[in-house]
Amino acid sequence: MKLQEIKNIDITGKKVFIRCDFNVPMDEYNNITDDRRIRSALNTIRYCIDHDCSVILSSHFGRPKGGFEEKYSLLPIAKRLHILLKQDIKMAPGVICDETLQMAKELKAGEILLLENMRFEAGETKNDEELSKKLASMAEIYINDAFGVSHRAHASVEGISKYFDIEHKAAGFLMAKEIKFFHHIIHNPKRPFIAIVGGSKVSGKLEALYNLIPKVDKIIIGGGMAFTFLKARGHEIGNSLVEDDLIPEALKIMEEAKSKGVKLYLPVDVVAAEAFDAEAIAKIATIQEMPKGWMGLDIGPASALLFSEALSDANTILWNGPMGVYEMDRFAKGSTKISHAVANSYATTVVGGGDTADLVRVTGDEDDMTFISTGGGASLELIEGKVLPGVKALVIEEND
């Protein structure tokens, strides 16, 4: 797969539309609490400015119900971009209203226009042709630098790309980096290759598990999803989260791992609580002695030790999903220990998924990871072996 990249097309002096992913966390006062996604986009933006482009930026933010909602406005993003880029950012009043289209038309070389939240337009998530066409009419070049939404066939991600030929559209630096990194990890990892898969549900990770089994040497399963596997093995799991309908799938995955010689690790103990509550009575219990009616909300210390030991000989580690309810301090120890173990490893370490990226930031391990993906669902679909709609549009067709 050969990806068209921004550095390989002529953008000098052109009007460029860049789809970014500025969907950053904010507190109740509209202060940005983590601007990593904004900082990640700066390379592409600066490259365009250095090439005398006039730049139109677009992104979604949150899930507005339809139409303008102040709390979902991109104004705080414009302010942060102004600080980071040290230049004025023109804020559009809408996405494709007449005033916005006029601002885009009059944009001069070196100037930046930020469109309002793409999802204020109902047509964005429906991949509406009319909206795609209007967005495309604003610029001569289309750049997709939003890896985090490239698994979605939306107007500003996929629809718009149809109106540009392969010499006038490309992946931005961030997008190209993410795609190449995941491609390399999945298809050409340095062994032993170990995957850590966590999070609450098996259903969300099923395809990824099936795709990983033939590729990895070991797979570690933690988080709420581990209980479906433990129940499949005949363990009593109390009131822990379980997807009974997926027990046959869990058995199939374990069977598959066994037949491929892949070592599959499950928790041997848990931090069990009487209720899903930060204040609930909790204690450490082995899997064999789960108190009746209690629920496991984190892996226990023996599991953390076992998993860390399993990681000790890794050359490549791919981690997607926390080991427990890390948002509650009492149930964050397991995830924190695994985070430290991954960070201290000599392996190439790749963290995918919003929760896991957030977790390694909280544990202070962010700088010790080789690569932290900006995309949760997108990185998962790449692991599943899918071609993302936003990426497909940027692939250079190679003649046989």
Swiss-Prot record:
GO molecular function: ADP binding; ATP binding; phosphoglycerate kinase activity
One of the protein's GO biological processes: glycolytic process
Cited Gene3D superfamilies: Phosphoglycerate kinase, N-terminal domain (3.40.50.1260)
Catalytic activity from the UniProt record: (2R)-3-phosphoglycerate + ATP = (2R)-3-phospho-glyceroyl phosphate + ADP
Pathway connected to this protein: Carbohydrate degradation; glycolysis; pyruvate from D-glyceraldehyde 3-phosphate: step 2/5
InterPro entries hit by this protein: Phosphoglycerate_kinase (IPR001576), Phosphoglycerate_kinase_CS (IPR015911), Phosphoglycerate_kinase_N (IPR015824), Phosphoglycerate_kinase_sf (IPR036043)
PROSITE patterns membership: PGLYCERATE_KINASE
Entry keyword set: ATP-binding, Cytoplasm, Glycolysis, Kinase, Nucleotide-binding, Transferase
Subcellular location: Cytoplasm
Ligand binding (substrate): D21, F22, N23, R37, H60, F61, G62, R63, R119, R152
EC number(s) recorded for this UniProt protein: 2.7.2.3
Subunit comment: Monomer.
PANTHER family reported in the protein's UniProt record: PHOSPHOGLYCERATE KINASE, PHOSPHOGLYCERATE KINASE 1, CHLOROPLASTIC-RELATED
Record's protein name: Phosphoglycerate kinase
Organism: Aliarcobacter butzleri (strain RM4018) (Arcobacter butzleri)
Organism lineage string: Bacteria, Pseudomonadati, Campylobacterota, Epsilonproteobacteria, Campylobacterales
